[in-house]
């Protein structure tokens, strides 16, 4: 978000609030295919994010300290977290591959939620099968 929408990034970091309309909620969290009623319902439930939590998310990661398998899932319509190049770099850092789903940032609330759930289930059951 910082490089693609710097003003929104600064506003969010200062206030914890990035969405002031259902349109922004759709743009930030959902794919274009998500029904308006889902977007509107989620918009009305949103509350400001903790500014401390936002700062914590900016801390560097240490993949070399991670000893458990990691599933890296990204969303095709997610511009909040990681563009495809960064998603692939994250997967490489954790010695795995990234899977991109046809969804927005809130992939479990989007139209492709079943694909997201299946990807998570596959990662978990695959991990347990190799124990």
For the regions a language model picked out, list residue spans one by one.
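Flexible "cap/lid" loop of the alpha/beta hydrolase fold
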Residues: 1-14, 53-60
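Conserved alpha/beta-hydrolase catalytic His-Asp/Glu region
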Residues: 17-58
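Alpha-helical elements of Rossmann-like donor-binding domains used by nucleotide-donor carbohydrate transfer enzymes
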Residues: 41, 85, 89, 115, ...
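Short alpha-helix in the alpha/beta-hydrolase fold that links the catalytic acid
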Residues: 58, 82-91
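Short, conserved loop/helix-junction motifs that constitute active-site signature segments
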Residues: 63-67, 91-94
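Short beta-strand/loop motif that positions the catalytic acidic residue
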Residues: 66, 72-74, 78
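Acidic catalytic loop of the alpha/beta-hydrolase fold
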Residues: 76-81, 106
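Catalytic active-site module of serine/aspartate enzymes centered on a nucleophile-bearing elbow/loop
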Residues: 94-131
């Amino acid at each position: 978000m910082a490089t693609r929408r710097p003003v929104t990034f600064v506003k969010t970091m200062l206030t914890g609030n990035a969405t002031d309309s259902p349109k922004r909620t759709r743009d930030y969290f959902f794919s274009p295919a998500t029904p308006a009623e889902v977007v509107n319902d989620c918009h009305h439930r949103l509350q400001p994010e903790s500014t401390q939590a936002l700062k914590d998310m900016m801390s560097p990661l240490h993949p070399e300290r991670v000893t458990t398998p990691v599933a890296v899932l990204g969303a095709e319509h997610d511009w909040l977290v990681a563009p495809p190049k960064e998603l692939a770099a994250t997967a490489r850092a954790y010695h795995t591959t990234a899977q991109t789903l046809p969804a927005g940032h809130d992939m479990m609330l989007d139209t492709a939620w079943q694909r997201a759930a299946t990807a998570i289930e596959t990662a978990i059951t695959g991990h347990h099968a190799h124990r």
